[in-house]
Amino acid sequence: MATNSSTEQSLTKKVWNLATTLAGQGIGFTDYITQLTYLLFLKMDAENVEMFGEESAIPTGYQWADLIAFDGLDLVKQYEETLKLLSELDNLIGTIYTKAQNKIDKPVYLKKVITMIDEEQWLIMDGDVKGAIYESILEKNGQDKKSGAGQYFTPRPLIQAMVDCINPQMGETVCDPACGTGGFLLTAYDYMKGQSASKEKRDFLRDKALHGVDNTPLVVTLASMNLYLHGIGTDRSPIVCEDSLEKEPSTLVDVILANPPFGTRPAGSVDINRPDFYVETKNNQLNFLQHMMLMLKTGGRAAVVLPDNVLFEAGAGETIRKRLLQDFNLHTILRLPTGIFYAQGVKANVLFFSKGQPTKEIWFYDYRTDIKHTLATNKLERHHLDDFVSCYNNRVEIYDAENNPQGRWRKYPVDEIIARDKTSLDITWIKPGGEVDDRSLAELMADIKDKSQTISRAVTELEKLLANIEEN
């Protein structure tokens, strides 16, 4: 009998080999994974009927058996009609098939995907195996530069370390307001699933504890299926398709885990008009930070990946940082190295904060200076962050001005932070080992672009200020 790991490896290889074949026909990896998702759900529904005698969740005439009976152009027509019907349902199925469209219009290749799925028994496969196969495909898609999917993918080792630090508990609610393919929610679920709890709490974890939001229909489909394959949200998806920033949070949550999108809002997005926000700004990351600050219950805690400019930007950035220190306990900042994200040149940090008490001191862990990771030769692994997690839990300062000035873990009293220009949190103390800048051209260009955007926003704010002075 094949082991779970061998089943996982062989099936992943099989699925990805077909992806490579379809790519040669102009069918991108993202389109392939989306169609795979649509078809896999149909197949698992059919297995549920056949093996367990359950009633099909798919309307008669549009089930798996109906689809595989067709060939040629009739197959394409039947598939497209099925997608249209299912996208209009108001349940988990409707979420998975949100704005579903067929992207494999050549019958021979559509049949290949259907045949591959039909050859396997998916429902009886261990949930962890199904989920691992699907996640590995999502990760491979994130690595594909042409797909652009890397923007939705946070490195799993970083997610795991963040969850280990936040320590979510059974009975708590966990939200990711920019959930991508669901990595944070799934990791939090796995973490809590291992805790002993009553049946009531286990049911709560499966059906009500998790909540994700994303404004891209395709990503909502992938996230919903990712969680469904792990047994989460079997009746209604915990993922909703909307723009988190457009309205005030309807409910408060215990835990927030997120890596909101960097950069400006996409073209065509609704302008942010939030009376509950502390300050008006067009900076996407600052708006997400405000939104998450307002989402937390008293006693709630958050771990959020944010770019460097959030730490030092003037104007709105300074206002938000002051509110964060005043109304929240911003207790820890993890400074991340470049080279760990699929989008090149990203300089980011993880901010850990809780609601209820003002900040008294901030602990910094510098995992950036003299740290070099690349996706090809020195990929970030969970063990690379072991020392940080240990420091986070133990709170014993490693830095010592005389004996260990290169120590990566040190604390600053909040008064010292407030006294800094613009209440800047952009702090480094470790002297680099060399003077050579070994960043790639892409990383250098990204850094220049980031600084240019910051300067541009500062000029805009200054122009507004001068205009107000002239009017008065």
Curated annotation (Swiss-Prot):
Keyword Iron attributed = no
Catalysed reactions, semicolon-separated: a 2'-deoxyadenosine in DNA + S-adenosyl-L-methionine = an N(6)-methyl-2'-deoxyadenosine in DNA + S-adenosyl-L-homocysteine + H(+)
Subunit annotation: The type I restriction/modification system is composed of three polypeptides R, M and S; the restriction enzyme has stoichiometry R(2)M(2)S(1) while the methyltransferase is M(2)S(1).
Function of the protein:
The subtype gamma methyltransferase (M) subunit of a type I restriction enzyme. The M and S subunits together form a methyltransferase (MTase) that methylates two adenine residues of an undetermined sequence. In the presence of the R subunit the complex can also act as an endonuclease, binding to the same target sequence but cutting the DNA some distance from this site. Whether the DNA is cut or modified depends on the methylation state of the target sequence. When the target site is unmodified, the DNA is cut.
* Xref: PROSITE patterns: N6_MTASE (PS00092)
* Pfam families in the record: HsdM_N (PF12161), N6_Mtase (PF02384)
Per UniProt, S-adenosyl-L-methionine binds at 151-156, 181-183, 214, 243-244
| Protein name in the entry | Type I restriction enzyme BthVORF4518P methylase subunit
Q: What is its EC number?
A: 2.1.1.72
Q: Please name the GO terms of the biological process aspect recorded for this protein, alphabetically.
A: DNA restriction-modification system; methylation
UniProt keyword Iron present: no
The record's listing under PANTHER family reads:
SLR6095 PROTEIN (PTHR42933), TYPE I RESTRICTION ENZYME ECOKI METHYLASE SUBUNIT (PTHR42933:SF4)
Record keywords? DNA-binding, Methyltransferase, Restriction system, S-adenosyl-L-methionine, Transferase
* Lineage of the organism: Bacteria, Pseudomonadati, Bacteroidota, Bacteroidia, Bacteroidales
- GO MF term list: DNA binding; N-methyltransferase activity; site-specific DNA-methyltransferase (adenine-specific) activity
Entry superkingdom? Bacteria
